[in-house]
Each structure stands twice: as C-alpha cells, then as structure tokens.
C-alpha cells in the first residue's frame, strides 16, 4: 500500500478536538489527510489530528514516507491503547471521487483514538474505507465474568 498526503494544516482545536483531546479550544492541532491505495486502487481516506506540540517540526515531515507511529516513538510518545469504533456512512463529492466511488456510495467509517498509558489522547483519526477493503473479524470472550470483544480489520 502507498500513501498520498492530500492536505496538512495547523488549526485550533475548536469544540470537537478540545473535547476529544481534553484541551482548551485554542490549543494548536496538526491535521493530515491521506489517501491510502494499493496497486493504484483507492482503499481509504484517513483524516488524522494530533496535538501540534507533540511532534517536533511536524510541518516538515513527509507523511507519505514516514509513519505517524514512528514519529510518536521518536518524540517519546508511547501508545498504550488504541480504540476503534466501526460504523457505516456514505461518501460524497471529492471524497467519493478520490475513492473511485459514485456519489452517495456506502463506506465503512472507523474512528480511531490512540492514548498513552497516562490516558492522554495522542491521535484522533477518522477513516473512510471502500467496502471491498473493509472486511473485519470480531471475537468475544467471557473471562472471569467479564466480556471482552476484539476485532481486526483485514
């Protein structure tokens, strides 16, 4: 798979990201929107937001080459928990065109929130996945009276 950066920008957290990251509305955030493809076939669009201060010189990093998680590691941010929320939606306009889909086509939507051991949110990503590439497996286990659900996207 390869990655094409569609846009990057620095912005204020605003209401949405201040609630997700538990920071004031005017906190600086960095946003990366990437198109993921395999063999020149669009797979997904990822809209990732991180705290601007979390990665040194973040504007200068080529995220088509370097992994966000490598940059976290270099900047001593250790991800402890990754939460995925799967839902369905439809895609329109530019996103539909980039994914090679018709207007209003269904997609699988995944919200990803990565946190450190201290519970600090390091990343929020919204992913729109072409259904042909959105197969996932879930498994539920009851252990000591507690239900645990795991899932895997493949």
Predicted regions mapped to residue ranges:
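C-terminal all-alpha effector/ligand-binding and dimerization domain
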Residues: 2-154
């Amino acid at each position: 798979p390869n990655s094409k950066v569609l846009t990057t920008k620095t912005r204020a957290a605003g209401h949405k990201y201040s609630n997700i990251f538990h920071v004031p509305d005017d906190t600086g955030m960095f946003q990366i929107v990437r198109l993921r493809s395999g063999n020149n076939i669009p797979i997904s669009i990822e809209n990732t937001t991180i705290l601007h201060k979390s990665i040194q010189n973040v504007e200068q990093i080529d995220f088509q080459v370097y992994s966000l998680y490598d940059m976290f590691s270099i900047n001593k941010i250790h991800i402890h928990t990754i939460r995925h929320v799967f839902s369905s939606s439809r895609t329109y306009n530019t996103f539909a065109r980039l994914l090679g889909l018709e207007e209003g086509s269904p997609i699988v939507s995944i919200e990803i929130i990565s946190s450190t051991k201290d519970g600090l949110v390091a990343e929020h990503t919204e992913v729109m996945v072409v259904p042909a590439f959105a197969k996932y497996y879930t498994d539920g286990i009851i252990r000591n009276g507690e239900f645990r659900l795991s899932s895997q996207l493949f």
